[in-house]
Design a protein with these regions (language model features):
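SAM-dependent methyltransferase catalytic-core segment centered on the flexible catalytic loop
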Residues: 8-73
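Flexible, glycine-/basic-rich loop-and-beta segments that form/coincide
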Residues: 113-172
Length: 179
């Protein structure tokens, strides 16, 4: 059985017949250079299995999303177009984003990030909706789209995002194929 098939079946089994009004996803993006090779630093570290863009797009997220629902989708800066494509494939329309500014304990930017053109100290949480007239909850309308938080273990997103999302959108489902 393929990884994508197993992952899809696990998601559907976990959700059962439940449809979720809010989905928070952090797919295991695969980074490749122009020749299609996996970036050496990612290949060397091999922390967890990653997925091809087409496999992420094929995940059955639309099947577990309510008719009117919100999607919060993490995407690395370099893969922004891919993140937008995934959002569309899952049946969501892009509406905005929240930027995570990665900081050190002293509050200064954490310049340890990687980047071919710039040293990345941010990551993007895309926000999309499914279904007409589907606004965020009232607290979201005063929420700025920047959150400064410390970087933790590799790929771990700040815990501070969960209560933010819970204030802004109903009934959260967290899906993360990566560990």
């Amino acid at each position: 059985m393929s990884t994508i098939q197993e992952t899809s079946e696990n998601l559907l089994r976990f959700c059962g017949d439940q449809k979720y009004a809010t989905i928070y996803a952090d797919p295991p993006w695969r980074f490749q250079n122009r020749t299609g090779k996996v970036a050496p630093e990612h290949k060397r570290l091999n922390r967890y299995e990653t997925m091809e863009l087409e496999d992420i797009m094929a995940l059955p997220v639309a099947q577990v999303a309510a008719e009117k629902s919100h999607l919060y989708l993490w995407v690395p800066n370099a893969l922004l177009p891919d993140g937008l494509a995934v959002m569309k494939a899952w049946g969501f329309e892009y509406k905005g984003n929240i930027i995570w500014e990665k900081v050190r304990k002293d509050g200064e930017p954490d310049g340890r990030g990687v980047g071919f053109y710039f040293r990345n100290v941010t990551e993007i949480l895309l926000f999309g909706v499914r279904g007409g007239g589907n606004r965020t909850l009232p607290p979201a309308r005063s929420q700025v789209n920047l959150l400064r938080a410390q970087k933790r273990e590799h790929s771990r997103k700040p815990d501070e995002f969960i209560p933010l999302i819970e204030r802004c959108s109903p009934c959260l489902l967290y899906t993360s194929p990566s560990p």
